[in-house]
Design a protein with these regions (language model features):
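Hydrophobic acceptor-binding patch used for acceptor engagement in glycosyltransferases
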Residues: 70-71
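Conserved RecA-like helicase motor-core motifs
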Residues: 34-47
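C-terminal interaction surface of TIR/SEFIR-family domains
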Residues: 1-35, 56, 101-189
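Active-site-adjacent loop/helix micro-motif of nuclease/hydrolase catalytic cores
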Residues: 19-20, 55-56, 79-85
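An anion/phosphate-binding loop that grips the pyrophosphate of nucleotide cofactors and donors
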Residues: 67
């Protein structure tokens, strides 16, 4: 392969409300709306599309390296994930090497008061008022506003996608540091 594989890589924590919101609302609506604004069918990476048997750290790294724009879904859970942070910092490093911002398009799911300074310094699209994860949200009046807002996100992403430089092999990739010995996370019941 010698080109981008994905237009957008949705980076999110696979737990709780952000996970359900991405799966139920954000990913499908964004993909549909992007299709209305791109010359070709949009390609949106979400880790749920990985093939069974994939070695997921390798596949995440490969997908991110072949993605034009990272769309992190910001929440407190996001910044507690070593993998989410590795995805974010990989794309920050690419922006630095290229001398070009706009390869990270953050969307705010919740909070923001307790984010690390590197995240608070970056502007984001605030989607907090539509952060309802359950499918019943699609039956509410606010759903129409959400769809209109995602349409605006798609328009902005389409504009940014047109500015992404050509793909290069060897983009910098960060993997999270392994947990410290004896620091194995305790399962929550």
């Amino acid at each position: 392969m010698s080109d981008y594989e994905f237009d957008v890589f949705i980076s999110y924590r696979r737990e709780g409300n952000p996970y359900n919101w991405v799966r139920n609302h954000f990913h499908p609506r964004l993909t549909d709306c992007l299709a209305d604004h791109l010359p070709d069918e949009p390609t949106v990476f979400i880790d749920e599309t990985m093939e069974v048997g994939s070695i997921w750290p390798d596949r995440l790294e490969e997908a991110l390296g072949r993605t034009r724009i990272l769309v992190p879904v910001l929440s407190p859970q996001y910044f507690r994930s070593r993998w989410c942070l590795a995805e974010w910092h990989s794309m920050v490093e690419r922006e630095r090497l290229l001398g070009q911002a706009g390869l990270i398009y953050p969307v705010l799911f919740s909070d923001s008061e307790n984010f690390p300074s590197f995240a608070r310094e970056r502007s984001w699209r605030d989607l907090k008022k539509w952060n309802k994860p359950d499918l019943v949200f699609q039956q509410t009046v606010r759903w129409i506003d959400f769809v209109e807002e995602i349409e605006n996100v798609a328009i902005e992403l389409a504009r940014l996608l047109g500015k992404v430089p050509p793909w290069e092999p060897g983009w910098p990739m960060r993997r999270p540091d392994p947990p410290m010995p004896g620091m194995t996370p305790v399962p929550r019941f």
